[in-house]
């Protein structure tokens, strides 16, 4: 398994022959690449946590270019269908549901404490034979993160730390305690001035309360498990 960060909340998880693109705002100011270049990587699926511009991002254009189905809440899949994605190229699901993708890969949709234009905000757990990844989407801290940890043994958690619209470093460190991942990657920070944060502050807070290893990635970096 390998996880590539494109800045903000955009990641690609490559595992079991799949390329799962999450929240692809590839045209974000920190991104080292373009939406067309990401489409050329041939993602097999596009997972969207909610429909705010910085998460829906370039999903429709990439889906059209690569032929990749879009996975999201039922309401979100209706929204992308209105933007020209064929219904057959959407995979609707909802919070608490699980879908199977490929060989031994399951995607579980988690709740998130946030807002959305249509439908509900969410996160994703991607459980595979090579490890389990949790992408929290945009969220505040919530105690039921402990339930996610009961259901899944998380190898990597991607958590927002930008504050203002999501958790900040303090809350995300507590989330790390709740989730008990082996590794944690901060996301959703420093993309624009309102969410400017020092990831080293988050790292220090995590190390004070958890055994999780913090990986501060740069846009374009790849984390291999």
Curated annotation (Swiss-Prot):
**What SMART domains does this protein's entry cite?**
Lactamase_B
Work out whether the entry's keyword set contains ATP-binding: no
Single GO molecular function = hydrolase activity
Q: Does this entry carry the keyword Hydrolase?
A: yes
Q: Which InterPro entries does this entry report, sorted A to Z?
A: Metallo-B-lactamas, RibonucZ/Hydroxyglut_hydro, UPF0173, UPF0173_UPF0282_UlaG_hydrolase
* Keyword entries, A-Z: Hydrolase
Which Pfam family would be a valid example here?
Lactamase_B_2
Q: Which family does it belong to?
A: Belongs to the UPF0173 family.
Q: What is this protein called?
A: UPF0173 metal-dependent hydrolase Tneu_1348
Its lineage opens with: Archaea, Thermoproteota, Thermoprotei, Thermoproteales, Thermoproteaceae
């Amino acid at each position: 398994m390998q996880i590539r960060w494109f800045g903000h909340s955009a990641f690609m998880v490559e595992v079991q022959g799949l390329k799962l693109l999450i929240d692809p705002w590839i045209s974000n100011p920190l991104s080292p690449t373009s939406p067309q270049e990401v489409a050329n990587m041939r993602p097999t699926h596009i997972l969207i946590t909610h429909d705010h511009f910085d998460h829906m991002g370039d999903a429709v254009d990439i889906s059209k270019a690569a032929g990749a189905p879009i996975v999201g809440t039922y309401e979100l899949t209706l929204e992308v269908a209105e933007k020209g994605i064929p219904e057959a190229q959407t995979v609707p699901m909802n919070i608490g549901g699980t879908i199977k993708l490929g060989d031994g890969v399951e995607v579980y949709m988690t709740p998130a404490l946030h807002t959305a234009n249509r439908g509900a905000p969410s996160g994703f757990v991607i459980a595979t034979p090579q490890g389990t990844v949790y992408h929290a989407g945009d969220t505040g801290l919530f105690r039921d993160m402990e339930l996610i940890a009961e259901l899944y043994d998380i190898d990597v958690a991607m958590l927002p730390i930008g504050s203002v619209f999501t958790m900040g470093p303090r809350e995300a460190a507590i989330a790390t305690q709740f989730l008990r991942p082996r590794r944690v990657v901060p996301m959703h920070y420093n993309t624009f001035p309102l969410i400017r944060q020092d990831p080293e502050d988050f790292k220090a807070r995590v190390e004070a309360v958890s055994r999780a290893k913090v990986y501060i990635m740069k846009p374009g970096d790849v984390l291999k498990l």
